[in-house]
């Protein structure tokens, strides 16, 4: 289950479907990723074909990322079976 968001536009999209805070061309992919993330209890639940889930390194160790498109990612941490600090970012 998704407990907290860092990106307010992504949270608004997740709760209402309003795309004003995200790139509209990413809406369908974001909807798929967020639905999967909200249903997951562990990182293994996110390891489905096409999601490209991967751990981050260095100072971002403990954070996971899912590719949205090109450099855009959904990043998050798991705490007690919940996705926390869910963010929508281009960190490259």
Each language-model region and where it sits:
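Glycine-rich, flexible loop/turn motifs
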Residues: 1, 9, 18, 42, ...
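Short amphipathic alpha-helical segments enriched in hydrophobics
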Residues: 14, 34, 38-45
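Generic alpha-helix structural propensity
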Residues: 5, 25, 29-32, 38, ...
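A short, surface-exposed loop/turn module that caps and links secondary-structure elements
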Residues: 41-64
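Enriched for short, Lys/Arg-rich terminal
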Residues: 54-57, 64-92
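Alpha-helix boundary/capping detector
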Residues: 28, 36-40, 60-63, 82
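Arg/Lys-rich, positively charged N-terminal/basic patches that mediate binding to nucleic acids
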Residues: 1-33
């Amino acid at each position: 289950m998704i407990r907290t968001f860092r990106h307010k536009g992504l949270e608004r999209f997740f709760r209402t479907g309003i795309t004003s805070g995200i790139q509209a061309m990413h809406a369908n992919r974001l909807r798929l990723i967020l639905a999967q993330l909200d249903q997951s209890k562990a990182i293994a639940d996110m390891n489905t074909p096409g999601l490209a889930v991967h751990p981050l390194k260095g100072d971002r160790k403990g954070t996971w990322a899912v590719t949205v498109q090109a450099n855009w990612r959904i990043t998050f941490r798991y705490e007690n079976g919940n996705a926390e600090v869910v963010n929508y970012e281009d960190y490259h």
